[in-house]
């Protein structure tokens, strides 16, 4: 494939947009550099770039596009909303209908509030938890991404008995001191941190199924023990289901795993491709939010008719019988094929999969936490990524990200992808 127009467009973008991209994850810095491919249109499971190259898409916009690109039911809903006016600044029937749909899907949501992104949703759940508990410190798990607000851009200190350090320039040390970061899937370290800091902790942020250093499931009993220990400390449990809600099961990870949080942050899939976020939880906690309570949150675009219409339409599609079973079936087929190709070409990989999402790590180690995910071959992944791009298979340009299937992928798409993986692995083996 040739990428002449993408390269020219990136050169122009560098003159006008910081780094040439509007999110750093879109750059190719983590896969050896070069101009990122600029897409022109998408339909179903496919992309076409500005040079006319066609791809099978496993990026799915980092998760939201579960129904494929330009799904007709969602497109019709967005078009109708646009014709009626996309922003009112008033209550609408659409936001009430959508809130009811979310509550029916996720019983832990007694009350809901819409915002404009997953970052906003997480940021506000933290504020609400602090208001409810009267405490200030937050706990999170290492490597789990909860958006780009200051409180969650914090890395672990030197151990569970130390406070965090800023993970980005511009995050003050004073804010990092309010965050305790511990390893995922490690109850003993969590207990040690709670023994020291629990009386100051307002809440713990949890990705119930990790999606930001690859797909990593909790060990059996881990989430139940997190709930027990955190509640014993008088703190709240916040589930960040921005990636997981409606991705693995209609009712989210909390329904799939049978564990209930106090507050939940939502985003990505629930917007049907448009900007959205939402948060909700127990009635007595959510009533801390203005205008009922003292925790302030507002938004000009929050609950806008276009996003509400798109979200409603997306959930209507996902209610169709058999879609999640299809995603699981195709995911299993893809997993089997990739592992067979790795064995055939003597390529060392570990593959983590849950239903229609998976991550290929270039390592032989088991991946259960962030340290293990970091200790994988990023250079090898970068080469693999570029080879797959030439094969017409679009992946996320990072060794940490997942492959996301959509309801529009077919068995033929999976078969082609497995063949492409085989050719890529053969090329990697030849250049070892």
UniProtKB/Swiss-Prot annotation:
<dbReference type="InterPro" id="IPR015424">
    <property type="entry name" value="PyrdxlP-dep_Trfase"/>
</dbReference>
<comment type="pathway">
    <text>Porphyrin-containing compound metabolism; protoporphyrin-IX biosynthesis; 5-aminolevulinate from L-glutamyl-tRNA(Glu): step 2/2.</text>
</comment>
<dbReference type="InterPro" id="IPR004639">
    <property type="entry name" value="4pyrrol_synth_GluAld_NH2Trfase"/>
</dbReference>
<dbReference type="GO" id="GO:0042286">
    <property type="term" value="F:glutamate-1-semialdehyde 2,1-aminomutase activity"/>
</dbReference>
<dbReference type="Pfam" id="PF00202">
    <property type="entry name" value="Aminotran_3"/>
</dbReference>
<comment type="similarity">
    <text>Belongs to the class-III pyridoxal-phosphate-dependent aminotransferase family. HemL subfamily.</text>
</comment>
<keyword id="KW-0663">Pyridoxal phosphate</keyword>
<dbReference type="GO" id="GO:0030170">
    <property type="term" value="F:pyridoxal phosphate binding"/>
</dbReference>
<feature type="modified residue" description="N6-(pyridoxal phosphate)lysine">
    <location>
        <position position="268"/>
    </location>
</feature>
<dbReference type="InterPro" id="IPR049704">
    <property type="entry name" value="Aminotrans_3_PPA_site"/>
</dbReference>
<dbReference type="GO" id="GO:0008483">
    <property type="term" value="F:transaminase activity"/>
</dbReference>
<keyword id="KW-0627">Porphyrin biosynthesis</keyword>
<dbReference type="GO" id="GO:0005737">
    <property type="term" value="C:cytoplasm"/>
</dbReference>
<dbReference type="InterPro" id="IPR015421">
    <property type="entry name" value="PyrdxlP-dep_Trfase_major"/>
</dbReference>
<comment type="subunit">
    <text>Homodimer.</text>
</comment>
<keyword id="KW-0963">Cytoplasm</keyword>
<protein>
    <recommendedName>
        <fullName>Glutamate-1-semialdehyde 2,1-aminomutase 1</fullName>
        <ecNumber>5.4.3.8</ecNumber>
    </recommendedName>
</protein>
<keyword id="KW-0413">Isomerase</keyword>
<dbReference type="InterPro" id="IPR015422">
    <property type="entry name" value="PyrdxlP-dep_Trfase_small"/>
</dbReference>
<dbReference type="GO" id="GO:0006782">
    <property type="term" value="P:protoporphyrinogen IX biosynthetic process"/>
</dbReference>
<dbReference type="InterPro" id="IPR005814">
    <property type="entry name" value="Aminotrans_3"/>
</dbReference>
